[in-house]
Each structure stands twice: as C-alpha cells, then as structure tokens.
Amino acid sequence: MSVRQTTADVVVVDYGLGNLRSVTRGLERAGANVSLSEDPAEFDAADGIVLPGVGAFSEGMDNAGPFREALVEQAEAGKPLFGICLGMQMLLTTSEEADHEGQGDAEGLDLIPGKNVRFSRDQTVPHMGWNELDVTRDHPLVEGVDSVGSKTPRADGTGGSVDGEHAYFVHSYYAVPDDESATVATTDYGTDFASIVANDAGNVFGTQFHPEKSGETGLRILRNYVDYCLDH
C-alpha cells in the first residue's frame, strides 16, 4: 500500500525579481517544502512551481527568458504553476507596459490568453494597500476563502467579498483575460479588475495581490495551493 505524500515540494523561481524571502516564508507556513531555483531542470521533480515578481514586465520576461520553455512545458503537462503579482501578469499573452515606453506590447508566457493594461490616468498609481476580493467562481485556490472575514455571498451560494484587510496590492497594471471565465476573483479600484485568474485546465493561476502579505486570507490561499500540488 502506497503512503500518501504529506508535504508538497515547491520550487520558487529565482529570476532576479521578487520578494523571495517573504514568498518562501509564506509557503513554508502553508506547509510546503520550498526551494529557490535558478535551474529549470529542477522543475521536473517539484510538485508545484511559483513564479513571484515585483517590477517591470519587460524586465521580468527578459530575466525569465531561460525559464520560459520549461515553464510552458511544465504548465502544459499539468503541473501547478502559481504566478504572484508580476508573476501573474507574466502568465498572460502581452502587456502594454512597454508600449508606454514606446517599445510596443511586450510578450508574456501566453498560458492565460489576455493582456495587461494600465489603470486610467484618473487613478492614483500604483494601487497600493489593502482591498477587497470578490470571488466570482469556484476554483481550488479560493476554497474556503469566503468564510475568512467574508461578506454575504450571492443568492446562488457563490461569491462574496473578503474583508478588505486581507488582500494586499502593489501594482500599476492589471490583467484583462480574453475569456471572462479565466477570472476567479475581482477587485474594485476605479474599475473592476481580475485579481485572481486561472487557465481552463485549472493548473495555471495567479494572484495580482501578494498572498504572503495578505493575512489569514493569503495564508488560506497558499495552503490551498499546497493542497492542490499534493492532489495533482
């Protein structure tokens, strides 16, 4: 009789951008065995991969260039891939961030079809601080999230806003998936934007906010990710 694995081995991609220490600590609190890696060959043995990131989209994609092929291959093979903040934006097809610098749209990993766009000039950027999540559909990443400081869910039993003191954001661009079904949760900052996204298969997902800095809700999401890695 086989013994069920109880600890997920998670690789955090070290491509030179991102708050690696806080992400690592958050995942460890969530029960993962975490390793930082600059070697795509180490993805094979991992139960899951986390792509963190803070900074400019173009720089992120340039730095992640050596990882690109391996990330796409692992994701297409069904391995759980979790993008955080810039890492979430990199999961999409393009970003207009470089276009504001006169360079045209920058290409992402194209694992979730869509584009990253800038908040309107009427909004103060970056969007920084605590804000609410409105869970719009089921996904393993948000299982139980509505029960953590939640407001009243919809009549059909789905959705509900998480108390705004549980999701911490720092960003000037936001994801616009081509397909609305890719949106798992939204947040209002002058406009409703996708704050959690996932691909059709469900194994590639991202949060625009930093779960490792988002209190009990963030910890719940990280635990859900670790559980997902163990189950898949």
From Swiss-Prot:
The keyword Amino-acid biosynthesis applies. It is found in: Cytoplasm. GO terms for biological process: L-histidine biosynthetic process. InterPro entries: Class_I_gatase-like, GATASE, Imidazole-glycPsynth_HisH. Pfam families: GATase (PF00117). One of its GO terms (molecular function) is lyase activity. Residues 9-232 form the Glutamine amidotransferase type-1 domain. It catalyses: 5-[(5-phospho-1-deoxy-D-ribulos-1-ylimino)methylamino]-1-(5-phospho-beta-D-ribosyl)imidazole-4-carboxamide + L-glutamine = D-erythro-1-(imidazol-4-yl)glycerol 3-phosphate + 5-amino-1-(5-phospho-beta-D-ribosyl)imidazole-4-carboxamide + L-glutamate + H(+); L-glutamine + H2O = L-glutamate + NH4(+). Keywords: Amino-acid biosynthesis, Cytoplasm, Glutamine amidotransferase, Histidine biosynthesis, Hydrolase, Lyase. The keyword Transmembrane helix does not apply. Its EC number is 4.3.2.10, 3.5.1.2. Pathway: Amino-acid biosynthesis; L-histidine biosynthesis; L-histidine from 5-phospho-alpha-D-ribose 1-diphosphate: step 5/9. GO terms for cellular component: cytoplasm. Residues 143-159 are annotated as: Insert. The active site is at C85 (nucleophile), H210, E212. Disulfide bonds: none annotated. CDD domains: GATase1_IGP_Synthase (cd01748). Heterodimer of HisH and HisF. IGPS catalyzes the conversion of PRFAR and glutamine to IGP, AICAR and glutamate. The HisH subunit catalyzes the hydrolysis of glutamine to glutamate and ammonia as part of the synthesis of IGP and AICAR. The resulting ammonia molecule is channeled to the active site of HisF. This is Imidazole glycerol phosphate synthase subunit HisH. The gene is hisH.
